[in-house]
Amino acid sequence: MEKIFIADKQDKDITAYSLYSVQQKERTKINPLEDIYPVLPDKKYQVIYADPPWDYGGKMQYDKTVIKDENEGFKKKIFLSSATFKYPTVKLKDLKKLDVKSIADDDCILFMWTTGPQMANSIELGEAWGFEYKTVAFVWDKMVHNSGRYTLSQTEFVLAFKRGKFPQPRGARNVKQMVTVHRGEHSVKPAEVIDGITKMFPEKAKIELFARNNYVGWDNWVLRYLIVKLR
């Protein structure tokens, strides 16, 4: 089993609601990156795979919780999105502060998950981390659609960024771009993508950022409450 780098937070699980301060007068959403994620490992990687917890801003609505009395009598509104109820989201300006460059080898590939609305932000983030955008590496057809402002949405994307030269040697050259897998739980990505990357770079040092699973041959940088058993 590879190394897992986790945020301890005094052995308490972190939920979306733990990131809200009940005493905060303005009741605005806070995303203290340094509080919810650990420091990056002191190691260099040739392959980095990231699924950033994008902040979509959400819409104005009342703060609600499964704990009935937590916000009893609270009438102010705050910004929430559906993702907020599943995991801590982080704003772009805070994601850009993450020193991914410090763990990237001179020759490194970054694979980053994104959605249509976050495409421009993803390229900006990759550049802030010290990479150059190259192409769309994977397209995930979720086989079901969500409502969209322009067309019904049913795809997500993995963008490929490069730093330096293409890591050598590489493995498989026949990994397909299109991944057609029915959508599962919220934000859980198909294993076929990381399996494909592993086939492409079987011998390279690899790390998954904002990880949800523990994959053989990969280091993981992850919140404690997102850790699941090795598949």
Go through each PLM region and give its residues.
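Class I S-adenosyl-L-methionine-dependent methyltransferase catalytic core
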Residues: 2-231
